[in-house]
Amino acid sequence: MEKEQIFQRNAGFFAFFLSGICAISSGVVVSILQEIYGFAYGMTGTLLSLMSIGNLLAGFASGMLPAKIGTKKTVVLLTAGYGAGYMIMGFSGWMLVLMLGFFMVGVAKGSTINTCTILVADNSGDRTKGMNIMHGCYALGALLCPFFIAAAMKAGNTVPMLVLAACGFLLWLTFCVTPAETKAMKKDWNIDKSFLKSRKFWMLTGLLFCQNAAETSVTGWMVTYFKGNGIISGSLSPYTVTVMWGATLIARLLIAFVIHIKNSYSAMIKMGIGCIIFYMGLMMASTQTTAILLLFAFAFAMAGMNPTAVASAGRMTSAASMGIMLPAASSGAIIMPWIIGIVSEYAGIEIGMASNIIPCAGMLLFSAAVKRLKE
């Protein structure tokens, strides 16, 4: 492997680590902002959904803008959203400004995942291992984010947003010095669009839609849910993110280095069953210890779903296919947090969070369906 390929792959790992810090912190940040400004659950859901809308639009922009301004300029432009978004959150409490900030963070998140997926996938000898390591880096960043926020909170309520802005600008600088063009990113969209006619491709996209919906709802709402119900004390509730992403990191590293998955489709079915069982248990938990253990188990069960599903696309994994699969799947992260916010507003947060069992069931159904396909 050439030095430039190694540099691009490692830059993808590092950038995705920083993205884990910036993206997953949004669930804690929205809880902090809710306490500071006292807005309703509906606004919380709106902010999280705006972030997901930015994530979705970034995927499509990543496919369109390179033809106009070039790949490098596209990546540098879109990934600036982490630093800029969190910075304006730290300086203003106006709702429109906060909405813009979450949208910009979402744009950076979407552009980062698309870019890192190609940087790592195109420069890894073992695609499945590379994807799980990359997502493990993301989980490590997510694991550390509550500690960054807790330390920053000691200096003031708005300081966490400024610390996250600094992380965002570091990510942006990483892309500024990294060559953006890889073999996969140089492919012309007209070379092969056969994946658009593949039932397997759309089944995997549906699976990722449900995975995005379930995961984003938990990372975005769980802190608010635990604090609102008094299941976990306010000072400890932000560390539920650490529990979740600690489990995710362990599971992804095990898949990458220890567990050899012989049949990815059977593995995804087992993951889907685990997600349903543990999420149902999580919703029935009434004590701090039980809630933490079940959250760990739920995150562990879901951890391998995304990288395994993307790797299962096989020959269909390209710049063109990722430009459709990932943005389409990310719409699940728009819809479900918004639904939870609306349901919580009218029926209580318990019912709102319980509705997240629907995408959990969807993961199992799509996993079973894609296994039955003969392609």
What annotation goes with each model-predicted range?
Residues K262-A309:
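C-terminal transmembrane helical hairpin of 12-TM major facilitator-type secondary transporters
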Residues G101-G136:
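Cytoplasmic helix-loop-helix junction between adjacent transmembrane helices
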Residues G38, G70, F91-L96, G125, ...:
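Helix-breaking motifs and short loop linkers at transmembrane-helix boundaries and internal kinks
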Residues A58-T71, M153, A251-N263, S344-E345:
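Helix-to-loop junctions at the C-terminal end of transmembrane segments
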Residues D126-R127, N132-A180:
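Helix-loop-helix hairpin linking two adjacent transmembrane segments in secondary transporters
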Residues L57-L96:
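Conserved MFS/SLC helix-loop-helix module at the cytosolic interface between two early adjacent transmembrane helices
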Residues G110-S124, M302-T317:
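Intracellular juxtamembrane helix-capping segments at the cytosolic ends
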Residues S26-G27, R199-I250:
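Extracytoplasmic gate region of multi-pass secondary transporters
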